[in-house]
Amino acid sequence: MKVFDLHCDTLSELRRAEMRGDGQTFARNNGHIDLEKLEKGDYMLQCFAAFVNLADPTPGADPLVTALEEIDVFKRMMERYSDRIAPVYRPEDIRKNAEAGKISGMLTIEEAGCCKGSLGVLRRMYELGVRMMTLTWNHENELASPNVVPGNGPIWPCMPNTETGLKEKGFEFLAETERLHIIADVSHLSDKGFWDIAEHSTRPFAASHSNCRALAPHCRNLTDEMIRVMAEKGGLVGLNYCAGFLDDQPSPDLCRSTTALMAKHAAHFKQVGGIEIIGLGSDFDGIGGKLELSDCSKMPLLADALRKEGFTEDEVEAIFFRNAQRFFENNL
């Protein structure tokens, strides 16, 4: 069965591997995602995020440089393995690549703070191929506030930020991303920021890697009200495989990442927002711990868990790739 994944942090890992010179490549590596595993997993499309940590302690770290270097990794991947994987810039590219027997790669950004508040840089990111973007990661920036409250680290589960959302520059970025047809991604955005986008957006938006707060009460997850609004607006949510966003335990160390829990979240999404809202957003190469889905080649395990949860074969296909394919073909 084909797979369409809305989020991974593989570019960041590959950039670090190049800096270390340890021989890890996109063709084959020890992480969750490489080309060999994607082919084994029968992937239709993988979204690759250029991830930036605004609090990077590396001396001289520049968020824009980091993002551009990760985008350069993506470009070189697409060029070197062009017989096996190809980029997506336009809606029709997804089908064209599939018909050519190639996996699709879509470039995204996780932390629009790398643009340093510049609409010119944002437009340049579009020209480089970026087609989806979170306004924040876990740190405040010129655009908006994240869903992690400062000083919230020792608290479990992490409580949501309901007080601060998009700033003036954030609203400008939202308008420009919509004009460019860059998908606004609300994963990592504060609750207030979510509602700002829900109120002011004119196009469908995504939560590329978030789960259900009703099942796992973490600030990174969506409330039922958020799920309903996203469904009404034609949005898309990617199931996140991170244990802390799947399980409801008194300590993060006790949380599990299992396909059964993923299927429970999928069932809740379906109950609240309908089957059409659900996609996959693994967060592979950005999450740790013991994962039942130990890498991207193991996706049949999740398909089996969804069937056991009561999903029909058509619904499993909708979650695995059809919903996401439709969403991007309609909105890029």
Model-derived features: positions:
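Structural preference for beta-strand elements that scaffold enzyme active sites
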Residues: 2-5, 45, 86, 104-108, ...
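Conserved, mostly hydrophobic/aromatic
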Residues: 7, 38, 90, 129, ...
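Active-site beta-loop-alpha junctions enriched in small/polar residues
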Residues: 9-11, 51, 90, 110-112, ...
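Short catalytic helix/loop segments, enriched in acidic residues and glycine
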Residues: 19-40, 301-303
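A metal-dependent hydrolase metal-coordination microenvironment
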Residues: 30-32, 37-123, 135-158, 162-179, ...
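Histidine/acidic residue-rich metal-binding segments in metalloenzymes
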Residues: 117-127, 151-206, 219-233, 260-276
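Short acidic/histidine-rich active-site segments
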Residues: 240-241, 273-296
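Mid-to-C-terminal alpha-helical segments outside catalytic/metal-binding sites
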Residues: 294-332
